[in-house]
Amino acid sequence: MRNIRIDVVEDDPASCQLVLDYLNRYQQENGEQFTVSVFDDGARIVEKYTPVYDILLLDIEMSEMDGMAAARRIRERDDKVVIVFITTAPQYAISGYEVRALSYLLKPLPWFAFSQELKKSIDMVRRNGDDSMLIETGNGQMRLNLADILYL
């Protein structure tokens, strides 16, 4: 199995560290391998985003650009990435449907709920299949669908 590429977008250092600790625990307990990137604001991930991630773990309330706005912009470029919101703001839960978020977790984040949603996310990534590959470009990496390759 290949590594699952996860991006954590969280502006609170303690919350970010908890998510990273949970990801490490999940890897150890379930034999998974993750490649994890971290951004501390929605604007930063939108600015640098290329469709190479499998799962986005997004906070909503952040200073420059909130996670919901970031998710909308990311969806314009990547319709495959699995989005999970992790936030203290329950009032935005319905808005998550606009960006086809898989789930919405509330802080304080309990391990069991996190692990269950992460399992669902990984299952969705694998179920959707990955008929793509990462290639290096002049601007970094991008995901190329194998069906789009006409000639080598």
How would you name each of these model-derived features?
Residues 1-7:
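Non-catalytic signal-transmission and effector/linker regions of two-component phosphorelay proteins
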Residues 4, 34, 81:
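Switch/coupling loops of ABC transporter nucleotide-binding domains
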Residues 10-12, 88:
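Acidic di-acidic motifs
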Residues 12-37, 76:
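Two-component/phosphorelay signaling modules centered on CheY-like receiver
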Residues 35-55:
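Acidic, metal-coordinating helix/loop segments flanking the phosphotransfer/catalytic sites
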Residues 47, 53-127:
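CheY-like receiver
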Residues 113-152:
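Conserved binding/recognition cores within well-folded domains
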